[in-house]
């Protein structure tokens, strides 16, 4: 009897420990009591949970915002559970309509497969490849007969589909909704049926699709999955969600210097959010950082520098993080120039500044260069230039700077 209660107590302790780790940073768990029950059953039987994440490979470059769910998957892996990444090569032909105000262009098969390879290369910067199963949903969706598709469609209603905000909005505004778009949440939900998933992860904007998975599993006689929704990561501006198109992002393929510098530009009030969602800093240390910032015993600058080191080390190496910090101190705290900067040889004696910036790789276009100049973000040998019509008299060793982190040294021909 003592052994029985001792074993039960240890099991409940482990369930509580795993729940505490898995709750970190989560916006919503539907329902949490099911997750607790699934963890208990997994520990009692020794059978790991199947934890699913679907990736629709429409945008191949991953930024920190995408890694929020990947970090949660990594936690599941470290607790001994099975992670399944579904590359949505079949659903990607539709494109997820979530949050979209109009019908999206369908990707070609070649585009999808190329993007999928890029995704796979990047997700393993966070996930353990040895503990990750990667599969494509065309393996089962592509084999459904038309009769089976009709049967799948019969498992829900148009009224239910119109509960989604984006569909409801488009319907009310008389914007077109293609029938095939209704199939996206159905197909994502059917992925959960095909895999008999125990848990599915997604952003808060994916809640409808994740709950569709629960609904369809129940319809097909399976135990419904738990839906875990992660917050949408705010961008570096602290206003809108992190997005490449908005320019407020940190890409996980960026250089250590760029990654470190961008992190240091983060508003102080977002530091703890980033610590919680995109680093692996233990909960106890996170609590100490929070307490230190609240009491004033930890300077926000020092907390942010550690955050920058953590992020750079995760996607590069600890040594690269320390080197990026050294350069940051050198350039931005001591106002020195970086040791390593792009060099450019110029044949002309005088060059229009916006064109020179494009040649030096400091701006993607002359119009963007003109905007940066007007904003006062451009310096020549440390002197700010605000006239976009400036003609630069090129001198040997001249240093051109755009923003806080981009430099180029000029040489004469």
Curated annotation (Swiss-Prot):
Its main location: cytoplasm. A motif ('HIGH' region) lies at residues 57-66. Its EC number is 6.1.1.1. It catalyses: tRNA(Tyr) + L-tyrosine + ATP = L-tyrosyl-tRNA(Tyr) + AMP + diphosphate + H(+). Keywords: Aminoacyl-tRNA synthetase, ATP-binding, Cytoplasm, Ligase, Nucleotide-binding, Protein biosynthesis, RNA-binding. It is an enzyme of class 6 (ligase). It is found in: Cytoplasm. ATP binds at residue 244. Transmembrane segments: none annotated. GO terms for biological process: tyrosyl-tRNA aminoacylation. One of its GO terms (cellular component) is cytosol. Residues 351-412 form the S4 RNA-binding domain. It comes from the Bacteria. CDD domains: S4 (cd00165), TyrRS_core (cd00805). The keyword RNA-binding applies. One of its GO terms (molecular function) is RNA binding. A motif ('KMSKS' region) lies at residues 241-245. Gene3D superfamilies: HUPs, RNA-binding S4 domain, Tyrosyl-Transfer RNA Synthetase. The keyword RNA-binding applies. Pfam families: S4 (PF01479), tRNA-synt_1b (PF00579). Catalyzes the attachment of tyrosine to tRNA(Tyr) in a two-step reaction: tyrosine is first activated by ATP to form Tyr-AMP and then transferred to the acceptor end of tRNA(Tyr). Homodimer. Belongs to the class-I aminoacyl-tRNA synthetase family. TyrS type 2 subfamily. HAMAP family: Tyr_tRNA_synth_type2. This is Tyrosine--tRNA ligase. It comes from Moorella thermoacetica (strain ATCC 39073 / JCM 9320).
């Amino acid at each position: 009897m003592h052994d029985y209660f001792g074993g039960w107590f240890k099991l409940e302790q482990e369930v509580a420990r795993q729940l505490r780790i898995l709750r970190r940073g989560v916006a919503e768990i539907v329902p949490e009591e099911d997750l607790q029950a699934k963890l208990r059953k997994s520990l009692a039987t020794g059978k790991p949970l199947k934890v699913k994440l679907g990736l629709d490979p429409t945008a191949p470059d991953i930024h920190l915002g995408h890694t929020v769910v990947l970090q949660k998957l990594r936690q599941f892996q470290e607790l001994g559970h099975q992670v399944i990444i579904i590359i949505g090569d079949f659903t990607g032909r539709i494109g997820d309509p979530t949050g979209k105000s109009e019908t999206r262009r369908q990707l070609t098969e070649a585009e999808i497969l190329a993007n999928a390879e890029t995704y796979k290369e990047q997700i393993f910067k966070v996930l353990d490849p040895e503990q990750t199963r990667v599969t494509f949903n065309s393996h089962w969706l592509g084999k459904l007969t038309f009769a089976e598709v009709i049967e799948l469609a019969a498992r829900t209603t148009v009224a239910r589909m119109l509960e989604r905000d984006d569909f409801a909005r488009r319907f009310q505004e008389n914007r077109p909704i293609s029938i095939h778009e209704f199939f996206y949440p159905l197909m994502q939900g059917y992925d959960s049926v095909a895999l008999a998933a125990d848990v599915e992860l997604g952003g808060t904007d994916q809640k409808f699709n994740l709950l569709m998975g629960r609904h369809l599993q129940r319809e097909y006689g399976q135990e419904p999955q738990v839906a875990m929704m992660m917050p949408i990561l705010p961008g570096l501006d602290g206003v809108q969600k992190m997005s490449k198109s908005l320019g407020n992002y940190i890409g996980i393929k960026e250089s250590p210097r760029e990654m470190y510098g961008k992190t240091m530009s983060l508003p102080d009030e977002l530091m703890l959010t980033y610590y919680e969602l995109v680093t692996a800093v233990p909960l106890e240390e996170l609590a100490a950082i929070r307490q230190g910032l609240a009491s004033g015993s930890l300077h926000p600058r020092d907390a942010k520098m550690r955050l920058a080191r953590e992020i750079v080390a995760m996607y590069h190496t600890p040594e690269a993080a320390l080197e990026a910090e050294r350069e940051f101190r050198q350039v931005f705290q001591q106002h020195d120039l970086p040791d390593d900067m792009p060099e450019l040889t110029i044949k002309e004696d005088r060059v229009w500044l916006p064109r020179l910036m494009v040649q030096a790789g400091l701006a993607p276009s002359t119009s963007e260069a003109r905007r940066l100049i007007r904003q006062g973000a451009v310096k020549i040998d440390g002197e700010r230039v605000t006239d976009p019509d400036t003609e630069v008299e090129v001198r040997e060793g001249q240093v051109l700077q755009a923003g806080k982190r981009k430099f180029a040294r000029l040489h004469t021909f």
